[in-house]
Structures are given as C-alpha cells and as structure tokens.
C-alpha cells in the first residue's frame, strides 16, 4: 500500500499489559513510531525515559473537565495525577498531548481546559465529541449538544486559539466540523481544479486508519462497532492479511461517500463529513447526518 505505519496503543492502561514492553521492543526493532494513549497512574521518570528510548513520540492523557467534573468521570484524584504526569512526560523528551471528550456534561468547561493546558505547556491539545452507545444516551441532557451550541463552542475556542497562537501548545483541529466553521469564516476555501472523485480531507475511516482489538478483530473505526475482519483469533474465525482487510468489501462500505444522507448534498463532502461515528451513535447508521452539524443543505 506504500503507507508509512504509525501505531496508537491504547487501553485501558496499556502499560499494565504483561507484554507491553515486548510489543514496544518489536516496534523499536522495526523503526515504527508510536503514541501511547493511556493513564497517568503508572508513569514514573524511569517509565517515561524507557518509552522515549524505544521510540515513543507522544503520550496522550485525558482531561474531561475541571477537577470536580473530571474526577467524577474518571476517579477521585485523577485530575491532579494527570497534571503531575505532564511534567514527567515532557521531562523525558516526549510530546505530551491532552485529549478532551466533549459532551453536554462538560461543554461549558472546555474554554477553561484550554487555559489549563496552555498554562502547563502541553504540546498538543485536541477534543472530540462523545459517541453515545444507545439512543437513550444520545438524547440525554447530560450528553447531547445542540448544533447551535456546538458552533458557539467552536467560535469561543477559535478566539482562545488565536489568543494562544504563540504559546507552547499546538491546537489540533481534530473535529471535522472545524472545516465547516473555517469555511463559513472565509478561512478555508475549496481549491480550484480538483479531481471530483478524490477525497481530500475529513473523516479518515477507510482512508488511513484501522483499529486492531486484542482479540485480533479489526474495526474500521475505534469509535463505533465496525468490524471488517480479523488478523488473528481462535475458533472458526477466518483470519485475513491486513492488506486484504483494508481493501476488502467490508471496508469498502465506509468509502461510499455518495450514500451519506446529508453530506452528499454539501460542497464540503470531500473535505469534512463531520463525524460519522457520532452519527452512528444517534441513528445506528454511518451515513446519517452528523447531529451537531448546523449547516442547512
């Protein structure tokens, strides 16, 4: 496929896996870069230095609210442990990333989280939306965000990002609705003379990522139930080379961009498409409209 591999290793807490360091040794031997998406609780100076030596580029932590909210979502003391881990990670020469999952629960706290990560010299900050696992969770007042509320949040955060553009923190515009927001502000323009059949940006499902579970099952996206094959496993499960999975019929389902109910009618189809995983959580369909997209088409 002529692709450059990059692994994101997550859990739970991947450090607790009995063969965690063996896996990293294999990646190091193959000169494959990787990121750990984990917890702060088992990080020490020695652990962070060992990660750096084995080729870890980045360690991602989660901050899902200010102290009270974050600890209620995670566990008591987690907020302070996370802040303490930032210095450990950066002190070992690793990049420290902070990821926030946005929902109705913490929507109003996100701007202050931005202030917090800048104060602590976090290298990379990004956020993504909560993917509900049931209809009840999708429409709950604790989790649901109205499209107008979400656009207002992006507007508030863009002003914060502009204020902090000379800080140590890079703000990753992870949510593809940023493209719509910047398009409306005139900061993103659709380039001329593009191939009409090429996807240039937006959701990377079936484009440049897959998820491999500990069982060997492969998902098109880690944020919703999307099985497309198995690399290994027991019993009667058929195992398939990764190339064949990525280019197989199950994966091709997620390349049918013309089937997207709302996005297919939008001029930003090849650049945005919102988050189909969030749409799946609401409607049990990858092709349903993004529930936080405010654009009328």
What are these regions (language model features)?
Residues 12, 64, 130, 271, ...:
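Flexible loop residues that form catalytic
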Residues 1-57:
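Conserved alpha-helical substructure of the radical SAM core
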Residues 177-297:
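Accessory C-terminal segments flanking Radical SAM cores
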Residues 52-53, 58, 62, 69-215, ...:
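Radical SAM enzyme [4Fe-4S]-AdoMet core and its adjacent flexible, acidic
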Residues 14, 41, 64, 103-104:
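Short, surface-exposed acidic/glycine-rich loop or hinge patches that mediate macromolecular interfaces
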């Amino acid at each position: 496929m002529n692709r450059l591999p990059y692994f994101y290793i997550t859990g739970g807490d991947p450090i607790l896996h009995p063969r965690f360091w063996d896996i990293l040794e294999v990646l190091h031997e193959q000169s494959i870069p990787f990121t750990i998406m984990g917890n702060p609780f088992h990080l020490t100076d020695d652990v962070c230095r060992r990660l750096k030596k084995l080729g870890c580029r980045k360690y991602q932590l989660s901050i899902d609210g200010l102290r009270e909210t974050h600890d209620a979502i995670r566990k008591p003391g987690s907020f302070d442990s996370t802040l303490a881990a930032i210095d450990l990670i950066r002190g070992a020469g690793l990049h420290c990333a902070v990821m926030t999952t946005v929902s109705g629960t913490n929507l109003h706290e996100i701007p202050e989280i931005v202030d917090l990560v800048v104060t602590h010299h976090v290298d990379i900050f990004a956020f993504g939306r909560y993917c509900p696992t049931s209809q009840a969770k999708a429409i709950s007042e604790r989790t649901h965000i109205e499209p107008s509320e979400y656009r207002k949040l992006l507007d508030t955060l863009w002003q914060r990002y502009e204020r902090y553009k000379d800080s140590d923190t890079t703000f990753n515009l992870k949510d593809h609705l940023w493209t719509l927001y910047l398009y409306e502000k005139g900061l993103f323009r659709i380039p001329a003379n593009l191939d009409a059949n090429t996807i240039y940006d937006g959701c990377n499902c079936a484009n440049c990522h897959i998820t491999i579970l500990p069982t060997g099952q492969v998902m098109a996206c880690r944020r919703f139930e999307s099985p497309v094959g198995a690399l290994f496993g027991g019993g009667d499960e058929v195992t398939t080379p990764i190339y064949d999975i990525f280019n197989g019929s199950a994966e091709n389902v997620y390349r049918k961009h013309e089937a997207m109910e709302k996005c297919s009618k939008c001029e930003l189809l090849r650049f945005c498409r919102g988050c189909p995983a969030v749409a799946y959580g609401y409607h049990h369909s990858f092709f349903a409209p993004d529930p936080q997209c405010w654009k009328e088409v």
